[in-house]
Amino acid sequence: MIFKQLFDQKSSTYTYLIASSKGREALIIDPVIENVSDYIILLKELDLRLVKVIDTHIHADHVTGASKLKDITKCSTIMGDHTPADAVEIKVKDDEYINLENLKIKAMYTPGHTSDSYSFLMDNYLFSGDTLLINGTGRTDFQNGDSKDAYNSIFNKLLKLPDETFLYPAHDYKGEKVSTIGKEKKQNPRLQVSSVDEYVELMNNLKLKKPTEIDFNVAKNINLGA
């Protein structure tokens, strides 16, 4: 399998490129529009044909490269079926599988950070979007976010996965690249709560600044960055 984790410095976004092997079909998760030319170069270097692009949710801190990649490669665009992005071609449901040749990727509806947030599970690789981060969790104070929904998504879905499941989030701000579900259970400070009410109180008191370009980014991303 080919697996590449790519990092956008400006937004601290992780983008993932997946393929079964060289010369085969590829999929990209959470592309950033400014980096599309780099993705195209990498695809050519690996002799890959991009067939699918997934956004885990409508992002607030960067513009997606989905539409631009579609224009260049004719790939299909994919999001969860709760997305407000009508331009997306394929809307997957909770527990539905996305096929990439011999690879299967399971869609998991994990709202909370936003109302349209999905995570994607491929074997023991979890691409959690902004729902579960390394030593953190996604904020819930905009885009119809909800702390109770986030608690349910994290504690009753993602943390039910095997402890050895690798965690690959859409962001990290401290240089961390990967964790595991087991490690997050033990060490993630936001997961050391005893009830949903305690988690809600914790999230409601974060007092985070609004992303500087949220209105522009969200408007663009509803149109897949076009």
Residue ranges and their predicted role:
Residues 17, 97-122:
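Core dinuclear metal-dependent hydrolase active-site scaffold
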Residues 18, 30, 57, 69, ...:
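Divalent metal-coordination and catalytic microenvironments
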Residues 53-63, 108-115, 167-174:
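Histidine-centered catalytic micro-motifs
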Residues 12, 23, 31-107, 186-194, ...:
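Active-site HxH/HxHxD metal-binding segment of metal-dependent hydrolases
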Residues 152-166, 170-226:
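Accessory terminal helices/loops
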Residues 31, 58, 82-83, 113-114, ...:
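Active-site metal-binding loops of divalent metal-dependent hydrolases
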Residues 27, 52-54, 127-128, 168:
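Residue-level marker for buried hydrophobic side chains located in beta-strands
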